[in-house]
């Protein structure tokens, strides 16, 4: 792309605002930003060229539960508003439920199961069952029995 510096700055400021950062964040070093702000800045950078697909690797890792929920909401809103396809690698069950409509469970160097959260909850595969219905699956527990 052959964009003028002024247009590049304007587009960057639009993306910064889109992810919920204040304009002054543009002039700050990463060391001056919180963990959540760094993640938002990274998301703004990923959106810079208006992609159709965004790849996210553990986007809520290191965030407190409130920050993680806010980031999940941001991802879902951007997905819906911009028509994005989001591929997300995560171990965060809360994020899976909040953001994902399709899930692929990987193990043993292959896809073990692919489907919706309800498909995961209904699975009798031992590892999938333990992961999605085990002791850490508190948020998705209310979904058990709903379509599963």
Annotate each predicted stretch with a short phrase.
Residues 7-24:
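Conserved ABC ATPase "signature" region
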Residues 29-33, 37:
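Conserved ABC ATPase signature
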Residues 48-52:
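A short, proline-enriched helix->beta-strand linker immediately N-terminal to the Walker B motif
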Residues 54-57:
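Catalytic Walker B motif of ABC-type/P-loop ATPase nucleotide-binding domains
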Residues 90-91:
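H-loop/switch region of ABC-family ATPase nucleotide-binding domains
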